[in-house]
């Protein structure tokens, strides 16, 4: 039995405390129910910039003092913003929990958003986007996601584009923070050992009382169906994910090696076929004995890097396959990879292959949850998605329950007609 | 921070070192560290250590090609390997009940790698693709150029990956000879970190590897004296990139003098690790010359490099380099302020402690320093020793090592005639 103490405070904030008796590391994740997908279309990157500015100065601390306070006890604090939620993450030693909580609280509720930091962070983010485009994988994958989710709320990268970030204004940052930094839209996950009573008392003392306002632009925190409906109301019919399926975006750069990414829709976490598709992804491209690696790399030597991954998102997940290959074989590699995905339904995995994929995933799961930070992130994510923090704990049971015919039917339903991004050497 | 666990340090009669750290958590890592890296290669065989590392899991002992992948992944294990200047290591991490599988695979790989001729020909293509990929990556180009330019001669001048000419020339005979010379009990440390009982684990290791006998006959005899640096030297390369990626590097001594090494690690954190570090604050935050900046220090068997790595707008590079040198000079001129020193020490101590959180992380930390120093003391004493590094010792290392007249600078900058990656749809 996992020892997690869940508390919902009078101000509406949900707190999950998970002690780790044999470890002295303390990881905290404060997740706010608001993400890049909620950015207005003409302000892509707004939430990301706002999140990044949280640690760049508060009413009582400069950016340097924030860093210095935590680093002088060997800790750190980092902001994050994905499509579904944003927030702050700290890592310290358990005995420094007061310092970590104090800085986290300060950054979350009292950021100063000075003009200087706004200006600086905006140009740093633009530089990061440019650097991401210097990397073959991120460059190609970024464009694939934009194509796949065209017209959808996930249609723009979380950090925005260089041009959209340039047009963000300071006042929108303040307004956004005022609207969303409210205890009732926050989940605080603490993995490590803290004295429960004192910890909760410290929060009660320093966090705003609430709920501050009942409605506002914050996504409702209710059950998944309620939230779904609320979100669907905001989605036009043509905004279904996968608008870019069947299309190809060709990118060029002075490279020696080509890169191809294929994107397919995937059932979002919590729906019946999601575990079957997860396993299909494993059979196809996770690990060195999976089909893509053993056939396209080891047998046919078409690639150095090849594989697949399923990216869970609250509204619409996707599954992608990737291959780095010689420019001369890019068309063959792309076709072969695409056929491997389509053939999964016609060439179903036998018991041994399925069991390999299952064991591979279970092993990765166990190994991947060795750190407190990983546990905290996982719990915060599924809690925000409305699945509850325990969702991740039951991954093994879900994977074990999937039968071969379910993998086949999930593959048949989802693994066809991908959106494609291809990076090839620029001519001349 | 709690002190790290004691290591059960054993040696089999054949000379194989076994280092065990029992810990709860249901996961175990079996990790073989071999003193075989690019530093021990001849120019003709440049890249053989890494090429060989790729071949290890392609069949060994009773495992045919592809079988190791199936067996390890079939029990949910994760395997990987790495090669650098001073070492090769390969490991399997798995649920602790699969310890026998992990040990069996690692034992087969270090004693009886098949080096199948057909697999070797195919794997060479994979490595040539890896080489191509590295040329496309600004970091890959930057680091390779740095080590090539900074050293006039010595064990770290050559690339770990090798070059197409040497890779084409490495056949099975050459690789097998290299394997037999280096994968010998006396040149291997086997790490077992995780949910196992040391006496039983040791018994299993004895059963699996007790009969492993092979003399260690290094291909190249080195003492590190052959290292010479080229600095001061500057190299600027143009590539299809959007930002400039640069590095400023200085000679540092080999990791023999532990006291110096601990002080250099603190210096690295003082200058450029964390958002409150000197370079981050001055160059990125206050003067906005860099879009990212950090420092690092090589702790290696032979003399290596201390570096400051940055990204920036090309137009700001001259000012950035000047400002970075001013910060470095300040540390050499006066001892660091108590608050700055304490920050660097605490952050470094915790970074080390946090790196031990996973079984992989702990075996990598112990294995690496054991391979470099031949003992476990440097690593296990690390946190205590770092906490004791004084301001004077940090200043002393800055004076001794960070000399502008010995500096190597490398930058990978955007092409001059506007070169943003183009997009088009088809």
Show where each model-derived region lies:
Chain A
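Glycine-centered tight beta-turn/hairpin loop motif at sheet-sheet or coil-to-beta transitions
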Residues: 10-12, 244
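His/Glu-based metal-binding/catalytic segments typifying zinc-dependent metallopeptidases
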Residues: 19-24, 29-34, 185, 213-290, ...
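Active/ligand-binding-proximal structured segments within catalytic/core domains
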Residues: 12, 19-70, 272-284, 292-294
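Short C-terminal domain-edge/linker segments immediately following a structured domain
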Residues: 46-49, 59-63, 119-123, 238, ...
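Charge-rich, well-structured scaffold segments of protease-associated domains
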Residues: 2, 8, 19, 65-230, ...
């Amino acid at each position: 039995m996992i020892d997690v103490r869940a508390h919902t405070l009078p101000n509406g904030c949900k707190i999950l405390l998970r002690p780790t008796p044999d470890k002295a590391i303390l990881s905290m994740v404060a997740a706010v129910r608001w993400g890049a997908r909620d950015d207005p279309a003409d302000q892509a990157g707004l939430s990301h910039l706002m999140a990044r500015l949280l640690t760049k100065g508060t009413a009582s601390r400069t950016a340097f003092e924030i860093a210095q306070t935590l680093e002088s006890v060997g800790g750190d604090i980092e902001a994050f913003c994905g499509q579904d939620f944003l927030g702050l993450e700290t890592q310290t030693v358990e005995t420094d929990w007061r310092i970590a909580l104090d800085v986290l609280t300060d950054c979350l509720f009292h950021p100063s958003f000075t003009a200087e930091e706004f200006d600086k962070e905006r140009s740093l983010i633009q530089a990061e986007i440019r650097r991401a485009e210097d990397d073959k994988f991120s460059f190609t994958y970024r464009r694939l996601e934009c194509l796949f989710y065209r017209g959808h709320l996930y249609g723009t990268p979380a950090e925005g584009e260089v041009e959209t970030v340039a047009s963000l204004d300071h006042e929108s940052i303040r307004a956004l923070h005022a609207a969303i930094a409210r205890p009732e839209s926050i989940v605080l996950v603490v993995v490590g050992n803290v004295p429960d009573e004192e910890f909760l008392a410290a929060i009660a003392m320093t966090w705003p009382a609430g709920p501050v306002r009942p409605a506002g632009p914050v996504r409702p925190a209710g059950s998944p169906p309620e939230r779904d409906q609320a979100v669907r109301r905001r989605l036009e019919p043509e905004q279904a994910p996968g608008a870019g399926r069947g299309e190809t975006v060709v990118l060029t750069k002075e490279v020696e090696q080509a890169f191809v990414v294929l994107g397919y829709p995937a059932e979002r976490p919590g729906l019946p076929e999601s575990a079957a598709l997860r396993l299909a992804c494993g059979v196809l491209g996770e690990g060195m004995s999976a089909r893509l690696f053993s056939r396209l790399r080891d047998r046919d030597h078409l690639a150095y890097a090849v594989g697949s991954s399923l990216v869970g998102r609250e509204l619409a997940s996707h599954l992608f396959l990737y291959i780095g290959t010689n420019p001369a074989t890019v068309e063959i590699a792309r076709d072969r990879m695409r056929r491997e995905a389509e053939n999964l339904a016609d060439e179903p995995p036998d018991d041994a292959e399925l069991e390999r994929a299952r064991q591979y995933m279970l092993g990765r799961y166990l190994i991947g949850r060795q750190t407190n930070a990983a546990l905290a992130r996982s719990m915060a994510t599924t809690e925000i998605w409305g699945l509850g923090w325990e969702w991740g704990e039951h991954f093994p049971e879900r994977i074990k329950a999937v039968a071969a015919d379910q993998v086949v039917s999930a593959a048949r339903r989802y693994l066809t007609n991908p959106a494609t991004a291809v990076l090839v050497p620029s001519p001349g | 921070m709690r002190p790290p666990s004691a290591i059960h340090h054993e040696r089999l009669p054949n000379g194989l070192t076994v280092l065990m750290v029992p810990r709860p958590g249901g996961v175990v890592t079996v990790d073989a560290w071999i003193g075989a890296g690019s530093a021990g290669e001849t120019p003709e065989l440049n890249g053989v250590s890494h090429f060989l590392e790729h071949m290890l899991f392609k069949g060994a002992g009773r495992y045919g090609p592809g079988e190791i992948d199936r067996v390890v992944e079939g029990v949910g294990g994760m395997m990987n390997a790495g090669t650098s200047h001073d070492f090769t290591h390969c490991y399997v991490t798995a649920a602790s009940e699969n310890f026998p599988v992990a040990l069996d695979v690692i034992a087969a790989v270090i004693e009886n790698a098949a080096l199948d001729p057909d697999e070797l020909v195919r794997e060479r293509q994979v490595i040539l693709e890896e080489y191509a990929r590295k040329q496309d990556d600004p970091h890959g180009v930057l680091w390779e150029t740095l080590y090539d330019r900074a050293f006039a001669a010595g064990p770290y001048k050559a690339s770990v990956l090798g070059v197409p000419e040497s890779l084409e020339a490495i056949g099975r005979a050459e690789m097998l000879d290299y394997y037999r010379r280096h994968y010998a009990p006396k040149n291997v440390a086997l790490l077992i970190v995780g949910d196992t009982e040391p006496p039983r684990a040791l018994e299993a290791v004895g059963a699996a590897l007790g009969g492993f006998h092979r003399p260690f006959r290094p291909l190249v005899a080195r003492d590190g004296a052959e290292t010479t640096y080229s600095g001061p030297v500057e190299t600027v390369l143009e590539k299809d990139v959007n930002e400039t990626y640069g590095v400023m590097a200085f000679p540092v001594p080999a990791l023999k003098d532990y006291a110096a090494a601990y002080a250099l690690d603190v210096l690295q954190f003082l200058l450029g690790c964390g958002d409150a570090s000197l370079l981050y604050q001055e160059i990125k935050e206050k003067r906005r010359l860099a879009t990212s900046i950090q420092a690092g220090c090589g702790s290696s068997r032979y003399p290596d490099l201390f570096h400051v790595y940055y990204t920036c707008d090309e137009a700001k590079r001259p000012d950035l380099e000047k400002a970075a040198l001013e910060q470095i000079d300040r540390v050499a001129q006066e001892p660091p302020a108590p608050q700055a020193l304490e920050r660097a020490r605490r952050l470094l101590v915790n970074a080390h402690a946090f790196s031990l959180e996973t079984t992989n992380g702990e075996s990598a930390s112990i294995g690496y320093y054991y391979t470099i120093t031949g003992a476990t003391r440097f690593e296990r004493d690390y946190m205590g020793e770092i906490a004791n590094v004084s301001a004077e010792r940090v200043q002393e290392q800055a004076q001794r090592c960070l000399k502008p007249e010995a500096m190597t600078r490398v930058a990978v900058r955007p092409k001059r005639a506007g070169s943003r990656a183009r997009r088009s749809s088809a």
